[in-house]
């Protein structure tokens, strides 16, 4: 019989992955569709690294519009995810009596007052991409609302349209550790991660070159 096994890994922040419900996806599609059709929508191109034409701001103000109300409702869900993230992060430390380790105290104290600094969505088309980059702030997230059918990759590994997370740690051995994680997202996937974690998005191809992949960050 095994004794209790504990695992510690305080030298890296985790990547949280969860699937949204159909109702959440529907609400977020309604928000982004409305913005897409708004002639007064605000471009986010000059604030982002992506080689993507259609990048639009999602207002995070307290204006009582149907879109902002729905988005604020979704923010309550994000608040809960951040708590899950903190618990996972704390579990990587050596913890006695459920005490939060000192490096995370400030994080914990601010969780009840989470502020979304900025929000936007991308409508990515054929051959558009996001180069390796990171974000400001403490935590970042990306979720997927639309994904077209891609043409088969020209190579055997089928990485077209993938998102790649890149470790900030320079030294990896390729056996027990790896410097990158490549994921092929599906509709409803949400990833939450440290804003300092670099990531990039590969381009894709569709049969009619009119496919749109919508992601929200």
Question: Which ranges hold each PLM region?
Answer:
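Sparse recognition of residues in long alpha-helices and their boundaries
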Residues: 94, 203-204
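Short amphipathic alpha-helical "recognition" segments used for binding
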Residues: 79, 206-207
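Catalytic core of non-heme Fe(II) oxygenases with the double-stranded beta-helix
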Residues: 113-192, 200-202, 208-212, 216
């Amino acid at each position: 019989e095994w004794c209790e096994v504990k695992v510690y890994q305080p030298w890296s922040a985790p990547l949280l992955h969860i699937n949204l419900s159909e109702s959440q996806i529907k609400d977020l599609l309604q928000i982004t569709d409305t913005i897409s059709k708004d002639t007064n929508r605000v471009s986010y191109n000059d604030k982002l690294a992506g080689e993507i034409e259609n990048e639009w701001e999602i207002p995070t103000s307290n204006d009582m519009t149907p879109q902002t109300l729905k988005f604020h409702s979704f923010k309550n869900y994000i608040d809960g995810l951040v708590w899950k993230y903190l618990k996972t992060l704390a579990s990587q430390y050596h913890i006695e009596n459920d005490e939060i380790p000192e490096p995370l105290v400030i994080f914990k104290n601010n969780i009840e007052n989470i502020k979304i600094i900025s929000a936007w969505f991308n409508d990515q088309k054929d051959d558009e991409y996001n180069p390796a980059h990171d974000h400001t702030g403490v935590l970042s997230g990306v979720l997927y609302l639309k994904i077209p059918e891609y043409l088969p990759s020209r190579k055997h590994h089928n990485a077209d349209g993938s998102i790649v997370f890149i470790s900030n740690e320079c030294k990896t051995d390729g056996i027990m550790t790896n410097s990158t994680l490549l994921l092929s997202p599906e509709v409803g996937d949400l990833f939450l991660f440290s804003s300092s974690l670099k990531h990039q998005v590969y381009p894709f191809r569709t049969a009619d070159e009119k496919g749109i992949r919508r992601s929200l960050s």
